Amino acid sequence: MKIAIVRLSALGDIIVSASFVACLKELFPQARIDWFVDERFAGILEHSSVIDNLCVLPLKRYLKSWNLIGLVRCVLKFRAETYDYVIDMQGLLKSALLGKLLKSRYFCGFDNDSARECLAGYLYEHGTKIAYEDSIMERNARVLFDALPVDENFQKFFWRAVSARGEMFGYTQEHANSVNALLFDGKKHVLFILEASLASKTYSAENFIALGRALAGDGAGEHGAQGTKRGGREDIAVLLLCYQDTQKAEEIYEELKGILPVKILPKMDLNLIKALMARMDLAIGGDTGITHLAWAMQRPSIALYGNTPLARFQLKGAKNFALSGNPNASYDKNDHSINAIAPEEIAKRAREIL
């Protein structure tokens, strides 16, 4: 059986979709799985034991430069392969067009009422019907379940997929060694994920500082690194992950450096971030891909939501918690209610995990 997965972007969506694909090797041991992805996000799927062939496309780059001929040539080279199933897990017109160009026995995706872009739904031979507003976990599981000859009921498949999700994400020993050199000896590492695609999805520097103080038991700041008067832990170290907002990272570092071990991480590619996440005892951040990666790699996490609805985006796991600052979130880019989540509430959850 030859299966092609089309999920081109974005990072968080790829991570969640990939988590549900991991179980397919268990269900279909002889299956070959190819994955079509934009080059910007290919690193998150590299070194996977589940993916047989990673088909990397310069989609964004070619579209930005209007190099449509180059893009078509790039896609057509994959037509030498014939797949049993091509599954578009994205539901956009661009992903549906790509899937349509591939040779397959069955081309599957979301129907026109369920796809993010309804026109995409008309291109599939089989379309899964599930409300776009439904849980992203259920949507990803359902489109795979409906497309493939799975010999078990949906609930069993769903939980099989959730249990197997960590098998998808791999990295090299070189990546692991690079990460190990950044860690503190004898500490439990808490990763603060400082950025997201939108400012409204990021927890503020002020709140991260208060959270660090709460974890150290130094809510008022007068107890120093050894303070434990408010339930702090001396075995905790904080790592700060940022990509562009170095000023935010430096502000948090300066406020926490006298209270507990803290370090600003160097810029990392996606392979290094996978190796980093594998060593984290807890990851805390907004509704963004790296926070989702903690769930996907079965690492403890606390995901913070504000302008996106918790019921739709929450990723559930044994040690994966979610908190929301707005029970009526409606995707408003000016909604910064993520910062209504009290740092002490997050710290309380963190203590339960650690």
Language-model segments: which ranges?
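Catalytic machinery of carbohydrate-active enzymes
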Residues: 1-354
